Amino acid sequence: MSYLFTSESVSEGHPDKVSDQISDAILDQFLATDPDSKVACETLVTTGQVVLAGEVKSRSYVDVQETARRVIERIGYTKSEYGFDTRSCGIFSSIHEQSADINRGVDRSDRSEQGAGDQGMMFGYATNETENYMPLTVDLAHHLLYELAAIRKEPSSPMPYLRPDAKSQVTIEHDDEGRPVRIDTIVISTQHDEFVQASDGISEAEADRMMQERIHHDIATILIPRVKMLYKPEIAALFDEKVRLFVNPTGKFVIGGPHGDTGLTGRKIIVDTYGGRASHGGGAFSGKDPSKVDRSAAYAARHIAKNMVAAGVADEMLVQVAYAIGVAEPVSIYVNTKGRSHVALSDGQIAEKIKKIFDMRPYAIEQRLKLRNPIYEETAAYGHFGREPYEAYKTFVDEHGTEQMRIVELFTWEKLDYVDKIRAEFGLS
């Protein structure tokens, strides 16, 4: 029997994502000049104000206020009428030194035996329903907002009224084998200028109706066609005439961003991962250096699941890994192929083979995925998974105010670099 499944995403201008991006930008600045930095940075944003807090152990000096303002400007909060803008917002920092009690459980003279930064369980997931091995619902939700932001930032934008805050939600019908067969509903809520105002000849209700009609038309005729072009024909065909499209269902979305809602680091953990299709251990990613297994082990688990599915071991795979604080080896590795395995092994036996192929000690993960590099700001909006790995030039400022250019490799956990090893281990051709 067919069923409906829904995932959501939020834009880079959503207040929680503003917080995530500031936290990760500060993390990157520390790692750029001291790769051994231990960082846990939390951000709160609200009307006209940014509050930074957290714990750091580093040889670097970072101008956290300047870093936060740069992020806010890049996102697009540059006008005072937004109630939150890069030039006038106040920034308060209460970042302090990391607890020695935590650090003693992590650092080791033999770095390969570095302990996990905390206890907990982390999950990785992959499915072959899309080219990037992500659930289509969340992949489409991300692409809708990524393209909407791109339209907003165009010099001669066809949607010049757009503001930074936005949300999307996608509902897809799946057949009884879990394959997407039809897009049922798309919801887009996007912040906008008040580009039609009540006057002598136009009531407030009429002005609101005119704005909503224009935005709905532009989403349907500008945004949706651009997003369809990103996909192969078989997925683009799921956008049929029966799709229900809701645009700004409340009728108006002028007040938004941190002025409309307070934002906090780590409040969009389902958007950051698999859109609700897979389990989540509860630990957020942003603002955390890779000694925190909440982040590094979740990336490693995704790397495993994606390579296993790409190798043909299963059509779908969930991987759980769990740690004790201060202990290097994980206490457990669990696999669930949801009954869609292509090998004559139990899920427990598959997990044993994973242990042979992948070293899941924290330091080994850091080295394998190059996680001690300043690579995190780019992850903090539009999902940490399903992104294309690439090299980028990034500029950082050292403690002397000198700019440094770095080439870094982003989204290394999305590489399909273990497929051959997996096929050899499982005897797959």
From Swiss-Prot:
Gene3D superfamilies: 3.30.300.10. GO terms for cellular component: cytoplasm. It catalyses: L-methionine + ATP + H2O = S-adenosyl-L-methionine + phosphate + diphosphate. ATP binds at residues 14, 165-167, 252-253, 261, 267-268, 284, 288. Its EC number is 2.5.1.6. It comes from the Bacteria. Pathway: Amino-acid biosynthesis; S-adenosyl-L-methionine biosynthesis; S-adenosyl-L-methionine from L-methionine: step 1/1. Mg(2+) binds at residue 16. Belongs to the AdoMet synthase family. Homotetramer; dimer of dimers. This is S-adenosylmethionine synthase. The gene is metK.
